């Protein structure tokens, strides 16, 4: 089919139309769609582009010589009857010359040369064919002579056997006749004797008659016995003669069948004849080449119909035809008319036999046979596979996947994936874990479609709605989070509401934990979450906003809107939580509530009196003014929200804070959001699971159950859960353990994959930056929120020259393992509201490990910052100490040039450095070699005095030069 457009041409080439369009555009042929017409010129340009892109040059070979050597075997019997194998080797050589159309003369010469070569090649091949035909004719003549000799010998042998058989039969007949004559003679004698006795008996007396009768009876019995023996002997001789005749007949039939098979084999047309040489033909389609390759020198390829008909005939004889008789001569005979010689069958059976120059037995080989083409031999059963369109697969890529699994999903070898990764700049192995993003890039690079797979994990077993559809939704208390800038009075405000003194117990008077409390008011229960206001506790404030229903934004009337105030507003807006503004410290003389309102309006928090939806309540945590109005507004907002949650259902909640207690183990503060949490329930929180062994309220009193919006402290988890993790109650501990272990493995795989992905980038960064100072730290904190905040604050201190390296961070006391880790990594241990035990302190003293304790996050950050400043390389500064004018120059042997100078400004010291200025241009910078006044060496010369000076490695001093004397000082740097 003629290809008139891009789609038809792509179908003809068996390739996607999109790939063909890209190749056409790369070749400079502008085609926009698959329906665009395609001319022969466009095809020629595409072909030229593809040849150039695959490295084709104008210096291609103009002449190709193909040599073919074909070795085959024939098998025949020699004069002694033994089978011999004769090797027949046919060598063919063909030269293809590419004509050059550059000039007419060159073309004619090439044409003439090609004709001469073709003629010489034709003559040579005809000579080879003639010699081969003579050889085959000679072999056939020898075979015919051998066959005639065998036939003559067989005829002579049969004649001798027939003569011997006739002689033997004649001898047997003569012997039988003699035995019969002897028996008849004996019977006649006995009869004559009996007659004589009868005659004598007539003359003898009567008393002898009984005796004579008995004797006659005995003689008759003996006569019958002799006749029976003679008859048996004659029958036995006849049977033996018939058996011998049957055996002779069988041998004769076998010999005739063998001779007939030999005659048929000789009459079969020879397939070894070499065909006449033909001019080179154009390349045939692959299918035609395959069909030709299936024929061999002695076994030409049969048509499909004939081959199909021959297969069932070989398995079972045709109905009605007699089964072939078993030939005694090794079953080498065949039915007439098969047209196949015994040589061919024997050669086929001996395919595995190696011959000189041919490892395949010389049978069933293609064009690339021979010693150099042994690896190219193909089995005749294989067939050519036409090129097919590449298969584009949809590969579902999970969060992490190994290289081997990714290759298996694409049905390719892992080495192909490794090659692509090497091109992308990553050296990987088949067992290396890739993250999802990298794996999807590799899949798309290999031409497949990458899809982010859904996790096939045990968490899918969790019913989406653990809460039953029939669970009754009941009103629940609101969860109120108090947020604001540090030192704006959030905790003091809560203290007044709770009638407690929490702020006084916090180190430094600032909140460093999330506090969860519930307060009973005349209008109902309210749960408060107190969040830190320090800038380091961003993640902690985000968790507070996530779990809350209403936000109380505390702003000091004397301070106004600060950075953490803005951050709290953004957290509340991101969670869609209504804001109630409490303007605190109105009892101070410098309080300015109106300025606070204006600043909050600029941040998008508009008071109700200005037409907004945020109530503003002026309060004082010190005097208690406005507290009732604040609670009234909070409960009013809760009524508007219509907060409800099921009570009679498995509990769900969120981890507000978690820590490792030395006596209690992992302890988590949980805010129940729905359902009822009871003591003894099996809970799952992230990678931690366990049974609730004890449950305490915010005052430390034991409680048996907690309903919605009630904060409790639970014990019994397997490890410290992450703050902000979701808590869920499961029916049995086995399912909780299974899901927790799966999450741990997934977290580890994701972490390793991300580390591997970032390894190359970090390596290149370190190479580019050169030497970077590292400050290794091990951080242990009392609760996870404080640990997170401290780690983030310290990591922000890193610069291009000094970097904070967090070797390990965890919750709990400082143990011996932490000290051993610090010894190995040369790290400093920071304990935030934790202490080291006795064994850890002793080990730290023995190894010289520095352990620092802090209760306030300010102090920890400031001291680490000071330590990093000490690690910075000092800054070098030049300080000019004096100016010197050269008045006279002296040449001193073995010393060099000495300048007689006058100190015009400042002071010149022996250890100072010098710049030489000529016409106010620096021509040399170096050091003083000597400083003398008169003949004495001096340490310094002050302004207004003369001196002699010589410089190291510089003698080009002239009168009128100026020396600028300076010193280099090092100045400590700070972050």
Swiss-Prot record:
InterPro entries: DNA-bd_dom_put_sf (IPR009061), EF-G-like_DII (IPR053905), EFTu-like_2 (IPR004161), IF2_assoc_dom_bac (IPR013575), IF2_II (IPR044145), IF2_N (IPR006847), P-loop_NTPase (IPR027417), Small_GTP-bd (IPR005225). Gene3D superfamilies: P-loop containing nucleotide triphosphate hydrolases (3.40.50.300), Putative DNA-binding domain, N-terminal subdomain of bacterial translation initiation factor IF2 (3.30.56.50), Translation factors (2.40.30.10), Translation initiation factor IF- 2, domain 3 (3.40.50.10050). Pfam families: EF-G_D2, GTP_EFTU, GTP_EFTU_D2, IF-2, IF2_assoc, IF2_N. The keyword Cell membrane does not apply. GO terms for cellular component: cytosol. The keyword Kinase does not apply. This is Translation initiation factor IF-2. It comes from Burkholderia pseudomallei (strain 1106a). The gene is infB.
């Amino acid at each position: 089919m003629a290809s008139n457009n891009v789609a038809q041409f792509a179908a003809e080439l068996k390739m996607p139309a999109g790939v063909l369009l890209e190749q056409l555009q790369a070749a400079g042929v502008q085609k926009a769609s698959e329906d665009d017409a395609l001319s022969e010129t466009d095809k020629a340009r595409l072909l030229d582009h593809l040849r150039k892109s695959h490295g084709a040059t104008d210096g291609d070979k103009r002449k190709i010589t193909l040599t073919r050597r074909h070795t085959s075997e024939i098998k025949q019997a020699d004069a002694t009857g033994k089978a011999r194998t004769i090797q027949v080797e046919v060598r063919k050589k063909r030269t293809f010359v590419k004509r050059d159309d550059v000039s007419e003369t060159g073309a004619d010469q090439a044409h003439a040369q090609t004709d001469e070569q073709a003629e010489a090649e034709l003559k040579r091949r005809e000579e080879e064919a003639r010699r081969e035909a003579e050889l085959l004719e000679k072999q056939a003549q020898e075979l015919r002579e051998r066959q005639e000799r065998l036939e003559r010998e067989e005829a002579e042998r049969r004649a001798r056997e027939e003569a011997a058989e006739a002689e033997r039969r004649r001898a047997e007949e003569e012997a039988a006749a003699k035995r019969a004559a002897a028996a008849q003679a004996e019977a006649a004698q006995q009869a004559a004797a009996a007659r004589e006795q009868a005659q004598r008996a007539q003359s003898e007396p009567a008393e002898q008659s009984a005796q004579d009768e008995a004797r006659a009876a005995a003689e008759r019995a003996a006569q019958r016995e002799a006749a029976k023996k003679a008859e048996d002997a004659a029958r036995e001789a006849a049977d033996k003669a018939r058996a011998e005749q049957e055996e002779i007949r069988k041998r004769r039939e076998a010999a005739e069948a063998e001779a007939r098979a030999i005659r048929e084999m000789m009459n079969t047309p020879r397939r070894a004849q070499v065909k006449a040489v033909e001019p080179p033909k154009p390349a045939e389609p692959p299918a035609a080449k395959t069909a030709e390759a299936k024929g061999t020198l002695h076994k030409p390829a049969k048509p499909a119909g004939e081959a199909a008909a021959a297969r069932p005939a070989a398995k079972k004889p045709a109905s009605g035809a007699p089964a072939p008789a078993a030939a005694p001569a090794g079953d080498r005979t065949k039915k007439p008319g098969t047209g196949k010689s015994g040589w061919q069958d024997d050669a086929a059976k001996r395919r595995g036999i190696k011959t000189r120059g041919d490892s395949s037995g010389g049978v069933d080989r293609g064009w690339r046979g021979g010693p150099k083409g042994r690896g190219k031999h193909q089995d005749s059963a294989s067939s050519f596979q036409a090129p097919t369109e590449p298969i584009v697969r949809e590969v579902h890529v999970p969060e992490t996947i190994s290289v081997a699994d990714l290759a298996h999903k694409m049905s390719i070898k892992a080495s192909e994936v490794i090659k692509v990764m090497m091109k992308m700049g990553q050296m990987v192995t088949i067992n290396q874990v890739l993250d999802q993003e990298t794996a999807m890039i590799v899949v798309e690079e290999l031409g497949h479609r990458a899809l982010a797979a859904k996790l096939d994990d045990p968490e899918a077993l969790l019913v989406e709605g653990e809460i039953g559809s029939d669970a009754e939704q009941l009103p629940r208390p609101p969860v109120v989070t108090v947020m604001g800038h540090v030192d704006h009075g959030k905790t003091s405000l809560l203290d007044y509401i709770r009638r407690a003194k929490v702020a006084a117990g916090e180190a430094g008077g600032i909140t460093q934990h999330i506090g969860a409390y519930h307060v009973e008011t005349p209008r109902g229960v309210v749960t408060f979450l107190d969040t830190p206001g320090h800038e380091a506790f961003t993640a902690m404030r985000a968790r507070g906003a996530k779990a809350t229903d209403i936000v109380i934004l505390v702003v000091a009337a004397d301070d106004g809107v600060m950075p953490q105030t803005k951050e709290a507003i953004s957290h509340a807006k991101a969670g869609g939580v209504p804001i109630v503004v409490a303007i605190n410290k109105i009892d101070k003389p410098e309080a300015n509530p109106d300025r606070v309102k204006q600043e909050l309006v600029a941040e998008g928090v508009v008071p109700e009196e200005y037409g907004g939806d945020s109530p503003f309540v002026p309060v004082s945590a010190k005097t208690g003014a406005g507290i009732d109005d604040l609670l009234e507004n909070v409960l009013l907002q809760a009524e508007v929200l219509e907060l409800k949650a099921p009570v009679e259902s498995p509990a769900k909640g969120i981890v507000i804070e978690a820590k490792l207690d030395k006596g209690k183990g992992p302890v988590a503060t949980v805010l129940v959001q729905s359902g009822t949490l009871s003591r003894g329930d099996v809970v799952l929180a992230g990678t931690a699971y366990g049974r609730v062994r004890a449950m305490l309220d915010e005052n430390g009193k034991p409680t048996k159950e907690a309903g919605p919006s009630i904060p409790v402290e639970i014990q019994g988890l397997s490890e410290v859960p992450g703050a902000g993790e979701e808590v869920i109650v499961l029916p049995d501990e086995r399912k909780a353990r299974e899901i927790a272990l799966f999450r741990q493995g997934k977290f580890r795989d994701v972490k390793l994959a991300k580390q591997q992905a970032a390894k190359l980038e970090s390596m290149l960064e370190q190479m580019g930056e050169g030497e970077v100072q590292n400050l290794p730290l091990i951080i242990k904190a009392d609760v996870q929120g404080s640990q997170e905040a401290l780690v983030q604050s310290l990591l922000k201190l890193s610069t291009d020259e000094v970097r904070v390296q967090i070797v390990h961070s965890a919750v709990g006391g400082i143990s011996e393992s932490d000290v051993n880790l610090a010894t190995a990594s040369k790290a400093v241990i920071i304990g935030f509201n934790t202490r080291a035990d006795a064994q850890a302190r002793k080990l730290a003293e023995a190894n010289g490990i520095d352990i620092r304790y802090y209760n306030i996050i300010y102090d920890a950050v400031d001291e680490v910052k000071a330590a990093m400043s000490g690690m910075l390389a000092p800054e070098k500064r030049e300080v000019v100490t004096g100016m010197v004018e050269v008045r006279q120059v002296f040449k001193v042997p073995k010393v060099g040039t000495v300048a007689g100078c006058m100190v015009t400004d400042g002071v010149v010291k022996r250890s100072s450095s010098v710049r030489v200025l000529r016409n106010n241009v620096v021509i040399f910078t170096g050091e003083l070699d000597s400083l003398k006044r008169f003949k004495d060496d001096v340490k310094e010369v002050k302004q207004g005095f003369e001196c002699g000076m010589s410089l190291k490695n510089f003698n080009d001093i002239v009168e009128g030069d100026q020396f600028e004397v300076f010193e280099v000082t090092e100045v400590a740097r700070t972050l």
